[in-house]
UniProtKB/Swiss-Prot annotation:
The chain crosses the membrane at residues 124-144. This is Uncharacterized protein MJ1107. Belongs to the M.jannaschii MJ0023/MJ0349/MJ1072/MJ1074/MJ1107/MJECL16 family. It is a single-pass membrane protein. Its main location: membrane. It comes from Methanocaldococcus jannaschii (strain ATCC 43067 / DSM 2661 / JAL-1 / JCM 10045 / NBRC 100440).
Length: 149
């Protein structure tokens, strides 16, 4: 289609050139040139305007589609929000798990410490008994031996 339009325009220009060449008066030729230029300019503007109006819906759709691809949509924001919530939830669960692990270690540490304190108490009691009984040991041993005789 474009080739045909270009061909018709080329033929029209060549015929107009021949017509202008035959005009003897220079002012008339210039005036004729101006009229022809104005005519083609007007035709060109009308054609461009007409083509633009025809292409306007297509261009609008293309522009909308391009903007849709480039701009963030509500769905995209919702997806990003969901991803962020999942990420934060995952991190919170990891922190809770670490807190539980530390709590378990603390409980084990207190249990071990409690066992050591109990052992230390027992050892102190035994040492105290040994010290106390050490003063009375000779008399106690004597009494035990006297019962055996």
């Amino acid at each position: 289609m474009k080739f045909f339009v270009v061909f018709v325009m080329a033929v029209a220009y060549s015929k107009l050139y021949e017509l202008i060449k035959n005009v003897k008066d220079e002012k008339e030729a210039e005036e004729l040139c101006k009229i022809i230029e104005e005519f083609f300019e007007k035709q060109c503007k009308e054609n461009v305007s007409k083509k633009f109006e025809e292409q306007k819906p297509v261009l609008k759709l293309e522009l909308k589609e391009e903007l849709r691809k480039e701009l963030t949509t509500k769905e995209d924001l919702e997806l990003i929000g969901e991803k962020i919530l999942r990420y934060v939830d995952n991190k919170i669960n990891q922190v809770i798990e670490k807190i539980n692990q530390l709590d378990k270690k603390i409980d084990e540490g207190f249990y071990q410490l409690d066992k050591k304190v109990d052992t230390l108490k027992r050892d102190i009691i035994i040492i105290a008994l040994i010290i106390i009984l050490a003063n009375y040991a000779p008399s106690i041993i004597g009494k035990i031996l006297s019962f055996l005789k």
